[in-house]
């Protein structure tokens, strides 16, 4: 069994399509078929069920897949460590970031690329659940996101800053001149809220638990970009972490008094796989992020 065969197997298991997998591997379809068949012969059992319509992983294939991914990840780390013995900063750096943290990371990304032009940075922006799943599968080197309410023993979360919930409005909104607002006062305004399950919405729901306030929730969505646009172009008030408006023109974060006095904070974190090797480029990016103005001015 060779690493090359495991790489081919993993790609086919991902795509379940010989034609697509061979294109992404830059090999011919016949080469891929031959290598998969050779691997199956070595193992003495089929890894895929094939017919004219589809390709399906067998039970043996499902068992092999996580082991193959772990082996490929270990081999990649071995090469990285040898490269880093030569003090060479290169290779790929794969970062996951939730929508709320994109603007915070932008400053560090620009500085990092300027300092280390030989490192190829791949940034994936998605939901926390998707990014955490990809982190566990070793598809990402680290994730920048809020600390989830339920912890995963496989993931280490390093706190960068603590934040509270705030009312986000456009700079011409009547609230923009206020130093703060209460949960009671929020009842007067039309709200555009993040959907349930997001960190900001969970923080808001915890704040209002046990109260009898009636809010005018007009819109719910899970896209920060659209919430920003709605806030900029209308008098809707949205509720997000204070950090989300860093670098955003035309928006103002108004602290919610009840949130400032509440012990339940939203913790911005770097998430990594626990007890695993962290490549030098990831360590350096994390260091630069911690020292960035975006983080320092948003730290308590």
Regions found by a protein language model. Give the residues of each.
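Short helix-boundary/capping micro-motifs
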Residues: 10-28
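N-terminal winged-helix
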Residues: 29-30, 34, 80, 86-116, ...
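A short LG(V/I)-centered, amphipathic sequence patch enriched
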Residues: 40-59
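A late-sequence structural motif
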Residues: 104, 253-299
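Short beta-strand-centered segments that line the small-molecule binding cleft or hinge
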Residues: 107-111, 129-165, 169, 233, ...
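Flexible hinge/capping segments at coil-to-helix
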Residues: 154-191
